[in-house]
Amino acid sequence: MQLYRERLWPSVWVFVATALVIPASLLVFLPISPTAGQVTAIVLYAGCVAALIATSPVIEVTGAEVTAGRARLPIGYAGVPEAFEKEQATLERGQRLDARAWLVIRGWISPVVKIPVTDAADPAPYWLVSTRRPAALAAAIVQAKSDAGSTPRSA
């Protein structure tokens, strides 16, 4: 049962900024050939857009696990999540960040959710995950834990 799902698509400004590859490639290739410049500009921009879309991770919460990108955390090993926005999110991604944490963060998405990992065998003390809906993600994890009848396992 899927309780939450979000794909971390790039923001519009990322696609606009990526479009700067067009004048850059035109500047390089127009002196050689206008056709080569135009074709190269289009191909490079299309490649950048395709890469941004293809590498957009999915955040998902089911009754059994939390998935962030390629990583999976059984719901029984997920601690009580904390949602952070604005300045607090910036601090979590910066000054308060533990180098051992599992990160699925995107620069174009400010809010984050910190999910403690209670598995003693896991080297990551917590996951830090970007999300546009931090309260909904945290609530979905709490609901999944409640539905599973699990309490946070401690190390």
List PLM regions with ranges.
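Short, aromatic-rich membrane-interface segments at the entry and exit
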Residues: 32-41
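N-terminal membrane-targeting/pre-transmembrane regions
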Residues: 1-31, 151-155
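A membrane-cytosol interface segment of integral membrane proteins
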Residues: 109-155
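Helix N-terminus capping/helix-initiation residues
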Residues: 11, 33-34, 69, 85
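Non-transmembrane, membrane-adjacent beta-strand/coil modules in membrane-associated proteins
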Residues: 69-128
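Conserved beta-hairpin
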Residues: 43-84
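Core segments of transmembrane alpha-helices
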Residues: 18-21, 42, 109
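Short, solvent-exposed secondary-structure boundary motifs
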Residues: 40-41, 47-51, 94-96, 105
